[in-house]
Amino acid sequence: MNFEEEMNAIIGRIRKIRIEKGISQLELANIANFSQSFLANVESGKKKPSVMTILRIAEALNVNPREFFPDSPTVNTKEDVKNQIINLLEKI
C-alpha cells in the first residue's frame, strides 16, 4: 500500500468511527477544537492530517489512535502511532 492509499484508509477510518458514534463533523470539530471546515477538508482528503491532528481526533472520539490503523497490529501506543504517522508523512 502506498502513502496515498494509507492516508486515505486512515481518513476513511476516522470518518467511519465518527459516524458509528453518531457524532457530526461540527460536534467532533468542536470537541477537538478544530473548525468544521478544517475537519471536512481532512475527511474529504483535501487536507492531510498531521500527527497532532490524528491524535486530537482520536482523543475527541475517545478511541485508541491505533483504531485508525486496522491493518497495523504492531501499533500499540500513542507514541507508536505518532511514529507511524511521521514515517508516512516523510514519504511525501
What are these regions (language model features)?
Residues 52-67:
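DNA major-groove recognition helix of helix-turn-helix/homeodomain DNA-binding modules
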Residues 19, 30, 59:
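Alpha-helical residues within the helix-turn-helix
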Residues 17, 31, 42-45, 71:
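Residues in the recognition helix of alpha-helical DNA-binding motifs
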